[in-house]
Structures are given as structure tokens and as C-alpha cells.
């Protein structure tokens, strides 16, 4: 794992999760042909040295939503999306799943107090709880993150467009959610 602006705490959490992390910054020399793929964060720019190296080596480059979908493809995907209230609904779902003693994976953008981290992907769980996001996927792919998840169960909280979103108009914002709801 690599990135610019990583704190010592983040690096420690990555190490504790079993990830190799060389520290704060970009390390294109660490990308070698033995690495299967590169997962591209939404804020990575097109001229990023690791991205350029991955392209040079012909590596599979995936956005975070693509990676999550591929890792949860055979699971029942429950996606909670919307402008506000996702964390509360996810917290209630975590409580219900645990009470029923159901194993589940999760990929969240918000910190949920009852979970040790924001991502847990396993081979055993048959359910994946995903926090959906309506933002642009990456510098290479201008589709919206919600377009990738293909939920079996979709839960929408309130929808509230603002000028700070990646959508130029309220109509474009609602269109993203309409596409998501029929995926």
C-alpha cells in the first residue's frame, strides 16, 4: 500500500492488517511484474509515478469500487447509499447481522464504532455490506462509484444535491441514483 499524506497511525494500521507499506509517498520502483494488480484511489492523479509504472508494466489497474465488486462478486451485496444517514443505517445492520450470528464482509467509507476498521473481506462470508458513494471513481474512469456495486439489496437514505458534489446539476445527481437503483 502506498499514498501521499499517510500518517504513522495509518501506516501502523496497514502493517497490522498484513499490508506491506513502505511509508508516506510513492514508490514506483516497488512495482514489479509479480504484482497482480494495482488498486487506484479516487484522488490519484493521471501523472502519478506509480500509476505510470503500472501502465508501463501492463498491470491490471482497478478502481476501489471495481476491486470491491470483484472481491464480493459471489456474495449477496447490500449497498447503503445516499447523502446522509448511511452510517446510522449501517450501524443498525451490523447489530442485526451480529445478533443473527451471520458472518459478513464490509467496505465502508465511514468509521462505524462497532467495527474494528473500514474494510473486511474474507472468503467465508456470504454477505457483503457496502457503503455506496456517488463520487467519481478515479482519474482514469469518470464513472460514479455507485455504478460498480450491482447490489442485490439497495438501501437509499435521503438524497440531497449540493454544489460540492461531482454532479453539475440536481438532475444529474438524481440520475446517478436512478441508474444505481435499477442496477
Name every feature range the model reports, one short phrase each:
Residues 1-13:
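NAD(P)-binding Rossmann-fold cofactor-contacting core
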Residues 2-4, 40-43:
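Structural motif
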Residues 5-6, 26, 110-111:
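Short beta->alpha linker loops
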Residues 12-16, 29-33, 42-183:
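Phosphate-binding loop of NTP-binding sites
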Residues 19-24:
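Conserved SAM-binding strand-loop segment of SAM-dependent methyltransferases
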Residues 36-37:
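Short, contiguous pre-domain boundary segments
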